[in-house]
Curated annotation (Swiss-Prot):
It comes from Listeria monocytogenes serovar 1/2a (strain ATCC BAA-679 / EGD-e). Has three domains with a flexible linker between the domains II and III and assumes an 'L' shape. Domain III is highly mobile and contacts RuvB. This is Holliday junction branch migration complex subunit RuvA. Residues 64-142 are annotated as: Domain II. GO terms for cellular component: cytoplasm; Holliday junction helicase complex; Holliday junction resolvase complex. Residues 1-63 are annotated as: Domain I. Residues 143-153 are annotated as: Flexible linker. GO terms for biological process: DNA recombination; DNA repair; SOS response. Residues 153-201 are annotated as: Domain III. Transmembrane segments: none annotated. One of its GO terms (molecular function) is ATP binding. The RuvA-RuvB-RuvC complex processes Holliday junction (HJ) DNA during genetic recombination and DNA repair, while the RuvA-RuvB complex plays an important role in the rescue of blocked DNA replication forks via replication fork reversal (RFR). RuvA specifically binds to HJ cruciform DNA, conferring on it an open structure. The RuvB hexamer acts as an ATP-dependent pump, pulling dsDNA into and through the RuvAB complex. HJ branch migration allows RuvC to scan DNA until it finds its consensus sequence, where it cleaves and resolves the cruciform DNA.
Length: 201
C-alpha cells in the first residue's frame, strides 16, 4: 500500500497526472489534474490511494491527506465508486460538502456527477456525524495568539482552531462559541460536530 509519492510532475492531462520518481512514471488519477499545473516540472508530493480490481490497479492522487480521508469515507457509501467519490471532492473545498451532509442538504449533493437523490440520501445516512473526527485529525494547524480562543478549554480551543483552518470566519465562529462553551467536558471531535450542526441551521 502506498502512502504518498514524491517526484517530478511531468505530464498533466484532463484525467490524470504523471509523476516521475526513481526513473518510473506513475499515472495518477486526480479530481482536478489542472490544479497541479503550477507544479508541472517541479517536485511535488502527492498523497495516494491504491484501488485494486481483478482487471485493473489504479492510483488516485490528492494534494492533502484531508482530501484522501474524505475520499475513503465516500467510498464506504453504498453506490459510490472511486470515480464518483473523486468527482465529489474535485472542487477542493470540503467545507460546503461537510456542511451539506450535516444539514441533510440532498439538493446540494445532487449537483455532483452520478449523484442522484437516492445516492445523496445514502451519503447523508452513512456519513452524517462521522466526518468531524476526520477533519479534526487531519488538519494540521499552529495555534496562533488568538483572542477568540482565550479562556476556552483545550478541547474547545482545538475545535475552534480546526474549524478556522477549515475556512469558517471569525464572525461565524464567535456566534457559536458561547453555545459551545455551555457544553462542558466534550471532546474536540464532539465540539466540531456540534458547531457544524449549529452553523448549518
Amino acid at each position: 500500500m502506498y502512502d504518498y509519492i514524491k517526484g517530478t510532475v511531468t505530464t498533466i492531462t484532463p484525467e490524470y497526472i504523471v509523476v516521475e520518481a526513481g526513473q518510473i512514471g506513475y499515472q495518477i488519477i486526480t479530481g482536478n489534474p489542472f490544479s497541479f499545473q503550477r507544479l508541472e516540472g517541479t517536485e511535488a508530493q502527492v498523497f495516494l490511494y491504491q484501488h485494486v480490481r481483478e482487471d485493473n490497479i489504479s492510483l488516485f492522487g490528492f494534494q492533502t491527506t484531508e482530501e484522501r480521508y474524505l475520499f475513503k469515507k465516500l467510498l464506504s457509501v453504498s453506490g459510490i465508486g472511486p470515480k464518483s467519490a473523486l468527482a465529489i471532492i474535485a472542487s477542493g473545498d470540503v467545507v460546503p460538502l461537510i456542511s451539506a451532509i450535516e444539514s441533510e442538504d440532498d439538493v446540494y449533493l445532487t449537483k455532483f456527477p452520478s449523484v442522484g437523490k437516492k445516492t445523496a440520501r445514502q451519503i447523508i445516512l452513512d456519513l452524517k456525524g462521522k466526518l468531524a473526527d476526520v477533519v479534526a485529525s487531519e488538519i494540521v494547524y499552529v495555534a496562533p495568539e488568538n483572542d477568540m480562543v482565550a479562556g476556552l478549554s483545550p478541547q474547545l480551543e482545538e475545535a475552534v482552531l480546526a474549524l478556522e483552518a477549515l475556512g469558517y470566519s471569525t464572525r461565524e465562529l464567535k456566534k457559536v462559541i458561547p453555545k459551545l462553551a455551555k457544553e462542558a467536558d466534550l471532546t474536540s471531535d464532539a465540539y466540531i460536530k456540534l458547531a457544524l450542526q449549529l452553523m448549518t441551521k
